[in-house]
């Protein structure tokens, strides 16, 4: 079983190379029309399986379509990856939508709403005291 350092190095290499493949070799219109980024790579300890989390500026429906198209093209992506890196076996890959960014944005929106409500409440209290 590889150590954490090796996992981190291989994950970093995979992220770099897959990003280059998405930018230069893959011809999917949705990817070229929207900003698509690899946010995270989960690589199994045996280096055989790789989950690639994608973020995008696209709407939710389009994001799901992007992930679906990437999963359809994963065999050609894996083939290109095999040509670019030296590994005994290129890991099986699966693309997933990274919902962490969306959840974070919704939490920030809720916090802003609470802040605005609190400010409005404070203004009403000051007006009532006057």
From Swiss-Prot:
Coarse class of the protein's main subcellular location: cytoplasm
Domain of life: Bacteria
GO MF assignments: ribosomal small subunit binding
Compartments in which it is found: Cytoplasm
GO cellular component, one term: cytosol
Keyword terms: Cytoplasm, Ribosome biogenesis
Pfam families in alphabetical order: RBFA
A biological process from GO: maturation of SSU-rRNA
Gene3D superfamilies named among the record's database cross-references: 3.30.300.20
Family: Belongs to the RbfA family.
Job description of the protein: One of several proteins that assist in the late maturation steps of the functional core of the 30S ribosomal subunit. Associates with free 30S ribosomal subunits (but not with 30S subunits that are part of 70S ribosomes or polysomes). Required for efficient processing of 16S rRNA. May interact with the 5'-terminal helix region of 16S rRNA.
Quaternary organization: Monomer. Binds 30S ribosomal subunits, but not 50S ribosomal subunits or 70S ribosomes.
Record-given protein name: Ribosome-binding factor A
Organism of derivation: Prochlorococcus marinus (strain MIT 9215)
């Amino acid at each position: 079983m590889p150590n954490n350092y090796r996992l981190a190095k291989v994950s970093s290499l995979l992220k770099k190379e897959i990003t280059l493949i998405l930018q230069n070799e893959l011809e999917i219109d949705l990817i070229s029309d929207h900003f698509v980024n690899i946010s995270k790579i989960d690589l199994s300890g045996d280096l055989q399986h790789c989950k690639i989390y994608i973020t995008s500026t696209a709407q939710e429906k389009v994001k799901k379509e992007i992930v679906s198209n990437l999963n359809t093209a994963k065999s050609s992506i894996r083939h290109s990856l095999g040509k670019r890196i030296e590994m005994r076996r290129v890991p099986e890959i699966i693309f997933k939508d990274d919902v962490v960014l969306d959840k974070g944005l919704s939490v920030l929106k809720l916090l802003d709403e609470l802040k605005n409500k609190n400010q409005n409440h404070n203004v009403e209290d000051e007006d009532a005291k006057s």
